[in-house]
UniProtKB/Swiss-Prot annotation:
Its main location: cytoplasm. GO terms for cellular component: cytoplasm. Pfam families: eRF1_1 (PF03463), eRF1_2 (PF03464), eRF1_3 (PF03465). It comes from the Archaea. Belongs to the eukaryotic release factor 1 family. GO terms for molecular function: translation release factor activity, codon specific. This is Peptide chain release factor subunit 1. It is found in: Cytoplasm. The lineage of its organism: Archaea, Methanobacteriati, Thermoplasmatota, Thermoplasmata, Thermoplasmatales. Heterodimer of two subunits, one of which binds GTP. Directs the termination of nascent peptide synthesis (translation) in response to the termination codons UAA, UAG and UGA. It comes from Thermoplasma volcanium (strain ATCC 51530 / DSM 4299 / JCM 9571 / NBRC 15438 / GSS1). InterPro entries: eFR1_2_sf, eRF1_1_Pelota, eRF1_1_sf, eRF1_2, eRF1_3, Peptide_chain-rel_aRF1, Peptide_chain-rel_eRF1/aRF1, Ribosomal_eL30-like_sf. Keywords: Cytoplasm, Protein biosynthesis. Disulfide bonds: none annotated.
């Protein structure tokens, strides 16, 4: 994950974690309901559909399965009463009796407003929850600008994640280079260049109007086309400086319509990959430069050291591996009120130090979200690093998935403890 606003990063992290938890849940039978509701779907139509399913499910032979499926459908219908319309991106319900210890089950309900619009209505009753549509939304959604151009045609578009969006395709009125109607060669060439200049100005205007409003979120712009036209278009003043500065590479492509945009994306794929790797490398290099200093420099790693530094508002940059999952477990004595926290689930149930009373579990908090909150409060920059690159693997394996660069060195220093 790269170049996302901090809030977007943590929302993506929370979303991914929720899907991982859902994937671990199973039912005793086919009694877990996954319901996807697109934003344009009428709630009344969904309720009518569920009533039909309720009627059908009344014929399930297994008494326990029938009871659990009917209870899940009733639960969904009761919750739908609170919605006049689906939210802007739709709504997803995961409801059913999940298997717990032994032969026990318990009712589970998870309602998700997805980060992107649901496109298909889906109802499934199975032994597991279906999260495939939501998992597809985890694909990186970096935005790139695209231009393909020659003297006869040009197309401007965006690459949004894996989806190519065409902004506009424009045909030129530039005549072919041959004599017509007895005109002199010099005069005809002049007319051709005037027409070409007007065409390039029009393409530049389309590109500027498309890219300028989104210039901060555009990672890079790629320019392609057959022959030397793309170089000429790039070198002249058809594009505003803000747009030109974002152009990363020029590529030879055979077409200048929508298929040309697809070809441009294929040609630029290595460049996109290199930019992502370069971004992670720069972040990790900054941290490693500090680690290599004799006194450890401004580097800290490990949950305890980083938490201490965040609480003292010392952290400038916080690096979090996308692959780590940590939960803080909080227990409380029902007698004296003593609390204990654990960074891992205890192998044995904890008891009170004072009287040996078994403690009650009162909270399971995601440690990453907790650190993120501290970082936001202190004004630290937060970057969640993929665990697919060499740098991301190093962060996860060598430093426990958590690393930070401080704003200043504290006199008594922060001890790095994994």
């Amino acid at each position: 994950m790269y170049f996302m606003a901090d809030d977007e990063q943590i929302r993506r992290y929370e979303f991914k974690r929720a899907l991982e938890e859902l994937s671990k849940l199973h039912g005793r039978g086919t009694e877990l309901i996954s319901l996807y509701i697109p934003p344009e779907k009428q709630i009344s139509d969904v309720v009518a559909y569920l009533r039909d399913e309720y009627s059908t499910s009344s014929n399930i032979k297994s008494k326990s399965t029938r009871k659990n499926v009917l209870a899940a459908i009733e639960s969904i219908m009761s919750r739908l009463k609170y919605y006049r319309f689906p939210p802007p991106n739709g709504l997803v319900f995961f409801v059913g009796h999940i298997a717990t210890r032994g032969d026990q089950t318990e009712m589970y309900t998870k309602i998700i407003e997805p980060p992107e619009p649901i496109t298909t209505f889906m109802y499934k009753c199975d032994s597991e929850f279906h999260t495939e549509m939501l998992k597809a939304m985890l694909d990186e959604k970096e935005i790139y600008g695209l231009i393909v151009i020659d003297r006869k045609e040009a197309t401007v578009g965006f690459l949004n994640g894996t989806r190519i969006e065409v902004v506009e395709n424009v045909q030129s009125q530039v005549p072919s280079k041959h004599h017509q109607g007895g005109q002199s060669s010099r005069r005809f060439e002049r007319l051709i260049e005037i027409a070409a200049n007007e065409f390039f100005k029009k393409v530049g205007e389309i590109a500027n109007n498309a890219f300028i409003p989104r210039i901060k979120e555009i990672r890079a712009i790629f320019l392609g086309g057959p022959g030397a036209t793309k170089e000429y278009f790039f070198e002249k003043d058809y594009l505003r400086n803000e747009v030109k500065d974002k152009i990363k590479d020029l590529f030879d492509v055979g077409y200048t319509d929508e298929s040309g945009l697809r070809e441009l994306v294929e040609k630029a794929s290595e460049s996109i990959k290199d930019m992502k790797i370069s971004r992670e490398k720069d972040l990790m290099d900054r941290f490693l430069r500090e680690v290599k200093k004799p006194d450890g420099g401004l580097a800290v790693y490990g949950e305890k050291a980083i938490r201490d530094a965040l609480e003292q508002k010392m952290v400038d940059l916080l690096l979090i591996s996308e692959g780590i999952r940590r939960v803080k477990y909080t227990y409380k004595c029902p007698t004296c009120g003593e609390e204990k926290t654990f960074s891992e689930e205890p192998s044995e149930w904890p008891v009170c130090d004072k009287d040996g009373t078994p403690l009650e579990l009162i909270g399971e908090d995601d440690m990453i979200e907790d650190l993120y909150k501290l970082a936001k409060e202190s004004g630290a920059q937060v970057e969640i690093i993929s665990d697919q690159s060499d740098e991301g693997k190093l962060l996860k394996q060598a430093f426990g998935g958590l690393a930070a660069v401080l704003r200043f060195i504290r006199k008594d220093n922060v001890q790095n403890v994994m």
